[in-house]
Every structure is written in structure tokens, then in C-alpha cells.
């Protein structure tokens, strides 16, 4: 009986569920000691550039995101751009670096991420953000590899995407 209870608890603790989303894998769960401070829905583009990779083959590489952040009523409350960086309507910004990722449940969509903050600007909502999750992604993958050849070197392509971003800050 104890082993059944332990197995059940392991399954429950291996993923976190946030209201209104699919199950969030433990690999991208917000660190302990952080609280959710803002949810935003992003709509925009992932911008890719066709260039030669390290092995000499042509490939699409991510240049930058370009998206608006919306509140639950659909109003624009900020922007997401190269860095990656998120800017809130109060002027505060947070930049970060992906620290973990999992494949999206939708194979035609970019991965879900956990991003660790690396820098801040301003004193507003994003001033103390320490982690950002990107979940519920739709679209955003690069064009087909066949569309990136030597003749297209330097060409940019914008792919539509949407995602939910959850911003976390220390609980204290």
C-alpha cells in the first residue's frame, strides 16, 4: 500500500498544473520559492535567418521573437523581442536565457521553455522577475530546411506564433 501511495505522489509531483493550461512538465516548473506575478498571452512572430551552420550546411536560425503581450481581456500590456527580452507597459524590462525546455505537445509548435532572468531595467512589474515560462505554444517553427539554400543566405522569414508567458518573482 505504501508503494502505491509513493507512486501516486510521484506522478502528482512530476508535473505542475496551472489553471487554464495543459499540464506543465516538471522540467520547466518554476523554481521553489517563486510566485506567479503575471500571465500574458503573446501573439506575433519568430524571426529566422537562413545562414550556413557550423557544419557548412544551410539552415534556419532564430534571430529574434517579435510579439505583443496581451492581458486576459486582450489589451496589449507589453512586448517581447530580441534578447530574449520582455517589456511591460510601465517601462520595466526583463531579459533572460533559456534554462530548460520540453517539446510542445503540438509537434508543429516551438518548445515550451523555462527562462532564467539575466537582467532588468526599470522599477515596474518586471523589475524582480526571476523566471519566465513559455507554454501553450502554437506555431513558430522555422520554414522547411529545403527553403534555405545558398542562394537565400541572409534571407529572413517570419513565422506566426502564439504562446502563454508566466512571469515569476521571489516569494519574499
Segments (PLM) and residue ranges:
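Sec-dependent signal peptide recognition
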Residues: 3-10
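Hydrophobic h-region of N-terminal signal peptides that target proteins for export
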Residues: 11-18
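Primary mode marks residue(s) on the alpha4-beta5-alpha5 output face of response regulator receiver
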Residues: 21-46, 54-172
